[in-house]
Amino acid sequence: NEDINYIKDQSHNAEKILKEYIDEIKSNFNLSNSKICLSGFSQGCMMSLNTGLTDEDPYNCIVGFSGKIIDKDDLSKRIKSSANVLLIHGDQDDIVPCSNLLEAKDFLLRHKINIHTKIINNCGHNIPIEASSTALEFIKKNFNI
């Protein structure tokens, strides 16, 4: 049985560490958030959404594979910016069910966040070529490449 408060606390701790790391990278390479795409698979997707949407300085875009929103009530209170978001999920995912993509899409739409989604047929909890290609095109479009 999941303890949602424990999960939320741990995700906040990880988010803080992730933001510190991103700040270090931004400083080392003289980057702003507008030059960064956050991306992740499974828990990495969850952290990319939390990190990307709770920073006051918007990221260029967020790409998430096979993830979900960790705690909708918590994230609702903490959203500070928007980014173009692409969520990709396999319809046969038995680790993080595909229904999480639809829930995340609904949540993001209600928060006026530009969301794109792709469900990959006959795909489990992995990133097939079709997902990588879709993500690459989305990233290139967002960076005008």
Regions of interest found by a model, annotated:
Residues 80-85:
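Short, proline-enriched alpha-helix->beta-strand connector loops that line the catalytic pocket
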Residues 39-44, 48:
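Gly/Ala-rich beta-loop-alpha elbow adjacent to hydrolase catalytic centers
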Residues 86-89, 93:
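Short beta-strand/loop motif that positions the catalytic acidic residue
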Residues 30-40:
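Alpha/beta-hydrolase fold nucleophile elbow
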Residues 50-54:
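Active-site signature of alpha/beta-hydrolase-fold catalytic machinery across serine-
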Residues 1-31:
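Serine-hydrolase catalytic machinery in alpha/beta-hydrolase-like enzymes
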